[in-house]
């Protein structure tokens, strides 16, 4: 009631609660010795079943059958047509792959499958020998699989030559549907937010780190199992929320198919003409230098065109232009909008107008050069393509965004931007 009266949003409420250490403790679960139960009151850490060959995988699959009922059980509907999901979470398989999900260069260190509290743990080096049997399991049980980040997990699995059809439930997408104004950058952040877990060693269990030594560290495996437990706990908690909000059909009919399409787009990447990009960068660099030289000629000195303080001295002290609006620090603003206004108002002042025109041209072409350079840097050397990441769970409005590189910051208001 207090938070409501103070109009605190979800993020502020979460920060306040965490500051009082009201969250549940989970870090100790990953620090216990291997021969301990390795469980906590808040997370059910699964029992690890190390898979070394196809026979061991077959044995685990056989033991998991009893706990792996079909989501269609006790219902006349096909799994994809169900309106609710929480009632069948106990008969699903949680999947989590540790590794890098970077499009165009993914990697995996370990894959885990958990059913009924027992987790099959497959190191990356083992998977090649069991891939056919593992793929058959994934194909036959996709509508019973629970993941955190279907798109990201698909990239990691693809690095192993594995394919995952649209799963039953995605805790990352579910969290976005339940709280669209909250974005978790990692599994740990999602668990901390939705499960109120205090992760004291969050940096130590960061997602996406690969150990290429080939040795299995018991501490690393305990952290892997902790991640597996987080996925299961998030699934149980968020499934109830999704049912309460009647969003399960939205999750399965819109969000998961979109994730599948985005995964394909990221994996294929965008073909680019590397030579043309290089030529454009060099041309923009020349234009930026020419504009800088012109600006210096009008200024009468080699003023730093990136320095607001030096620009203010030239524009307002030397050239006598009327100052722009003040910033919070007390200085005058020299952003693009303010400079454009000054250029319009300085038409009768040939020196000032020439300087401002050259300055604006320098800024514009320099920005275009930097954008093209970022695209060149993002080209994958293996296939000559750009593999951006499309963010599906960032904007509360539901729009997509792209990062690494950001393809949405390319200006298209002029011919040069459209050429890019």
Q: Predicted regions span which residues?
A:
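Conserved "right-hand" nucleotidyltransferase catalytic core of DNA-directed polymerases
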Residues: 1-124, 182, 210-415
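A structural signal for short, well-ordered beta-strand segments and their strand-loop junctions
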Residues: 93-96, 145-148, 167-168
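Short amphipathic alpha-helical segments and helix-helix/interface helices
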Residues: 58-61, 110, 131-139, 154
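Conserved ANL (AMP-binding/adenylate-forming) active-site segment centered on the GW(Y/F)…HTG consensus within
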Residues: 417-420
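Short active-site loop/helix that positions an aromatic residue
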Residues: 150-161, 172-181, 191, 313-319
């Amino acid at each position: 009631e207090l938070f409501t009266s103070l109009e605190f949003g979800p993020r502020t409420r979460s920060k306040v609660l965490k500051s009082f250490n009201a969250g549940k403790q989970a870090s100790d679960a990953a620090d216990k010795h291997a021969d301990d139960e390795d469980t906590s009151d808040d997370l059910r850490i699964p029992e690890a079943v190390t898979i070394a060959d196809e026979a061991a995988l077959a044995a685990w699959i056989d033991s998991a059958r009893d706990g792996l009922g079909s989501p269609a059980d006790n219902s006349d509907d096909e799994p994809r047509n169900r309106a609710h999901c929480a009632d069948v979470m106990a008969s699903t398989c949680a999947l989590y792959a540790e590794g890098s999900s970077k499009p165009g260069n993914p990697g995996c260190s370990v894959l885990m499958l958990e059913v009924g509290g027992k987790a099959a743990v497959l190191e990356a080096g083992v998977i090649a020998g069991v891939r056919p049997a593992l793929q058959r399991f994934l194909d036959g049980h996709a509508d019973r699989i629970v993941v955190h980040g279907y798109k990201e997990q698909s990239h990691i699995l693809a690095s192993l030559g594995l394919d995952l059809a649209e799963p039953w439930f995605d805790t990352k997408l579910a969290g976005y549907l339940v709280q669209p104004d909250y974005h978790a950058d990692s599994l740990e952040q999602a668990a901390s937010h939705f499960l109120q877990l205090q992760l004291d060693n969050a940096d130590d269990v960061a997602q996406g780190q690969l150990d290429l030594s080939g040795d299995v560290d018991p501490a690393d495996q305990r952290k892997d199992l902790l991640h597996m437990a987080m996925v299961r706990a998030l699934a149980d908690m968020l499934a109830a929320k999704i049912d309460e909000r009647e969003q399960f059909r939205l999750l399965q009919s819109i969000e998961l198919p979109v994730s599948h399409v985005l995964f394909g787009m990221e994996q294929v990447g965008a073909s680019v003409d590397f030579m043309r990009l290089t030529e454009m960068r060099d041309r923009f660099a020349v234009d930026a230098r020419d504009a800088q030289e012109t600006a210096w000629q009008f200024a009468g000195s080699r003023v730093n065109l990136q320095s607001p303080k030096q620009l203010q001295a030239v524009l307002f002290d030397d050239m006598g232009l009327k100052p722009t609006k003040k910033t919070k620090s007390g200085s005058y603003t020299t952003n693009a909008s303010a400079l454009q206004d000054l250029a319009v108002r300085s038409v009768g002042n040939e020196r000032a107008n020439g300087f401002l025109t050259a300055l604006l041209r320098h800024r514009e072409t320099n920005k275009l050069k930097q954008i093209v350079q970022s695209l060149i840097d993002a080209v994958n050397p293996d296939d000559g393509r750009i593999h951006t990441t499309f963010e599906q769970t960032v904007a509360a409005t539901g729009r997509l965004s792209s990062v690494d590189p950001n393809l949405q910051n390319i200006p298209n208001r002029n011919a040069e931007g459209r050429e890019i």
